[in-house]
């Protein structure tokens, strides 16, 4: 096994991937939501969204290092659900302001950019937490051969994987972030076929949100021209 392969503990189980990439992604989502105009957050205080995100992330990290993977996963789903609902709520308010012509071009651009970036960060977290039973379940299985997404590494012959030192390859958060980014830009996965129905459903929602945000910007640009 190469130096960059997943480490193996004394009892034979592999250590889970670092937690900081998904944590940073959720902190970015909280910051982007807090930066939205008050009219797009229902009049809530600016500190409230980031406080909720930080509070839940703190608990998630604590339970992660305690080894309580069930609570860690449940809290992760709660956090994902909250930020997803908040994003859709803000998008609905943005649509309302655009249709009523109550928003300036600059505020529309910054708000749409915040929601668009939040969209692929949030859904990257969903894919990371749900695929193959979540990060802890994936870490207990040598190699990643059964999941909702068919990553290119999963299709390599065993001898090719062994020669490349990728026999124990498993997707990390960056792989799901790349998948979510492509879904937001191309409205479909590019190099990763989708196998599970739940994944197809989530990707449809993500693509619709991304398309709605871009349609708002395009419609406003046409009106300005």
Predicted segment positions?
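N-terminal membrane topogenic signal
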Residues: 10-25
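Pore-domain transmembrane helices of cation channels
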Residues: 98-136
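Cytoplasmic-side transmembrane-helix entry/capping segments in multi-pass membrane proteins
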Residues: 48-49, 71-83
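Structural signature of hydrophobic alpha-helical transmembrane segments
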Residues: 21, 43-57
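Short, hydrophobic transmembrane alpha-helix segments
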Residues: 33-46, 65-69
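Membrane-proximal soluble regions of multi-pass membrane proteins
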Residues: 132-191
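Pore domain of cation channels
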Residues: 170-225
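Membrane-embedded alpha-helical segments in integral membrane proteins
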Residues: 26-40, 61, 92-93
């Amino acid at each position: 096994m190469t130096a960059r392969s997943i480490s193996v503990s004394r009892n034979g189980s592999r250590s889970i991937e670092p937690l900081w990439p998904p944590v940073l992604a959720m902190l970015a989502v909280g910051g982007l939501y807090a930066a939205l105009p008050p009219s797009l957050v229902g009049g809530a205080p600016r500190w409230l969204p980031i406080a909720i995100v930080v509070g839940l992330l703190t608990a998630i990290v604590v339970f992660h290092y305690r080894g309580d993977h069930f609570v860690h996963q449940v809290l992760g789903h709660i956090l994902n659900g909250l930020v997803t609902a908040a994003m859709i709520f803000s998008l609905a308010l943005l649509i309302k302001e655009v249709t009523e012509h109550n928003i300036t071009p600059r505020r529309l651009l910054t708000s749409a950019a915040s929601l668009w970036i939040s969209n692929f960060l949030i859904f990257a977290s969903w894919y990371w937490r749900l695929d193959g039973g979540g990060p802890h379940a994936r870490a207990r299985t040598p190699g990643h051969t059964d999941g909702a997404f068919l990553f290119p590494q999963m299709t390599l012959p065993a001898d090719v994987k062994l020669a490349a030192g990728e026999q124990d390859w498993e997707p990390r958060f960056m792989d799901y972030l790349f998948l979510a980014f492509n879904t937001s830009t191309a409205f479909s996965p590019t190099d990763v076929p989708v196998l599970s129905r739940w994944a197809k459903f989530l990707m449809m929602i993500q693509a619709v949100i991304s398309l709605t945000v871009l349609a708002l910007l395009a419609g406003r640009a046409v009106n300005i021209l």
